[in-house]
Swiss-Prot record:
Oligomeric and partner information: Heterooligomer composed of large and small subunits.
Gene from which the chain derives: xseA
Name of the protein in its database record: Exodeoxyribonuclease 7 large subunit
Molecular-function GO term, any one: exodeoxyribonuclease VII activity
NCBIfam families xrefs: xseA (TIGR00237)
Organism field: Rickettsia africae (strain ESF-5)
GO biological process, one term: DNA catabolic process
Keyword S-adenosyl-L-methionine: no
Source superkingdom: Bacteria
UniProt main location, coarse: cytoplasm
EC number: 3.1.11.6
Lineage: Bacteria, Pseudomonadati, Pseudomonadota, Alphaproteobacteria, Rickettsiales
Function of the protein: Bidirectionally degrades single-stranded DNA into large acid-insoluble oligonucleotides, which are then degraded further into small acid-soluble oligonucleotides.
GO cellular component: cytoplasm; exodeoxyribonuclease VII complex
């Protein structure tokens, strides 16, 4: 009893604030930065943009607070029941005497939740067109190959070995972590880093590689920032993540997808021996074609020589004919000149005799006068015949002559002509004109 009293008297006294701060210091100093795995429950997002929820496992519960700047960095929606791994610092909240985890990073861990997030992200990025870019062809025989992967492990060794085995070339390694919270950012920065190098140091193709693993292990390669870096890369990218059955979002944004890291090395460079054999085959084909081409042109030269000899003979023959023609012309020219001089002299004599010219013109005038007289007589007879014909036709059309042939003209009382039964039906008085006179008839 006395001991209890003494202990009570010697126990240190704290205020509520002091004990709350003391507990806060103990939590923050002893636990520091931790990771906790559990299931989200009781999720609430305040108007301030901060998220409050519990992380539970069976009956145990850990209160969590995700501040707005951290929540904005999370690229998938939070839901109750989602399994996650949270990184952060333990602290206590004096307002209700509880401890809580201040979230610094949050990653999904349950397969169902991760697949849901993956499908939602894939649909959104596909809608943006990040998976439909124009693929850059992988260059043939690149002089520099960039490799982004972990510096440790079998992957980098397999890639280096395969490239050196097939076609040795310069390899530039950009070491990154291929798993973990910041892995996606590191790989994206490596892609951007290669693209920003000076042209002389820039690789011609980039291999992004990692060995196989679970969906959690490969999750960094589904990171949105990494997909955008692959899409924006001006250097062609070969993605080689996991095994052949493993697919990540970087595979859809890369210029070529390799089923394994070793296959990526094979896509990057050809086999030296096969290439050498191919070159030798091409060399043989080139030599054979060159030989045939030379023989073909040699035969053409022979044919051209034959044609040249024939043309020379033909030209010489034609030249001989031309010479003979020239000689004949020279011989005939004096005779031709003499003949033309004779014609000129004869023409001159005819021109100086006016009597002959007058007689010729008189005879020509006589012929023309006779032709004109005959033509005028023929034209006059033709006009007289047409006049007589038209007079006869005109006389036959005179209605007096028609009346003489027994016809009559019937008029109504008002003098209107009645040319049919219908027009005469309503008339009572008719005037009928004959060739020798006119009578009036009244209808009874």
């Amino acid at each position: 009893m006395l001991d209890n009293f003494i202990a009570h008297q010697t126990t240190k006294e704290f205020s509520v604030s002091e004990i709350s701060n003391k507990i806060k210091e103990l939590l923050e100093n002893n636990f520091g930065y931790i990771k906790v795995k559990g299931e989200i429950s009781g999720l609430k997002i305040a108007n301030s943009g901060h998220a409050y929820f519990n992380l539970k496992e069976n009956t145990a519960i850990l209160a969590c607070t995700c501040w707005r700047p951290i929540l904005a960095k999370i690229k998938f929606p939070l839901n109750d029941g989602m399994e996650v791994v949270i990184s952060g610092k333990l602290s206590s909240y004096a307002g209700n005497s509880r401890y809580q985890l201040s979230v610094d990073n949050l990653q999904p861990t349950g397969l169902g939740a991760m697949l849901q997030i993956l499908n939602e992200r894939k649909a959104r990025l596909e809608k943006e067109g990040l998976f439909n870019k124009i693929r850059i062809p992988i260059p043939f025989l690149p002089d520099k190959i960039g490799v982004i992967t972990s510096i440790t492990g079998a992957v980098i060794k397999d890639i280096i070995h395969r490239i050196r085995e097939r076609f040795p070339t310069r390899i530039i390694i950009w070491p990154v972590s291929v798993q973990g919270e910041n892995s996606g950012n590191e790989i994206a920065e490596a892609i951007e880093g290669f693209n920003n190098l000076e042209e002389v140091n820039k690789p011609r193709v980039i291999i992004v590689a990692r060995g196989g693993g679970s969906i959690e292990d490969l999750w960094s390669f589904n990171d949105e920032i990494l997909v955008r870096a692959a899409y924006n890369s001006k250097i062609p990218i070969i993605s080689a993540v996991g095994h052949e059955v493993d697919y990540t979002l970087i595979d859809l944004a890369a210029d070529k997808r390799a089923p394994t890291p070793t296959a990526a090395a094979e896509f990057a460079v050809p086999v030296h021996s096969i290439l050498n054999n191919t070159l030798q085959s091409y060399e043989k084909i080139l030599l054979n074609n060159t030989s045939r081409l030379i023989k073909y042109h040699e035969q053409n030269i022979v044919n051209y020589n034959k044609i040249h000899r024939y043309l020379s003979h033909y030209i010489n023959h034609r030249q001989q004919l031309l010479d003979e023609t020239g000689f004949n012309l020279l011989d005939a020219l004096p005779c031709f000149i003499e003949l033309q001089e004779t014609k000129i002299k004869s023409f001159s004599k005819e021109r100086v005799n006016p009597a002959k010219i007058i007689n010729y013109k008189t005879l020509e005038l006589t012929h023309q006068t006779a032709y004109l007289s005959k033509s005028a007589n023929n034209t006059l007879k033709n006009f007289e015949y047409k006049l007589e014909l038209n007079s006869t036709l005109l006389a036959s059309l005179d209605y007096h002559n028609v009346l003489k042939r027994g016809f009559a003209i019937v008029k109504g009382e008002t003098g209107n002509f009645l040319s049919s039964k219908i027009t005469a039906a309503n008339e009572k008085i008719f005037n009928i004109k004959f060739s020798d006179g006119e009578i009036k008839v009244v209808r009874a």
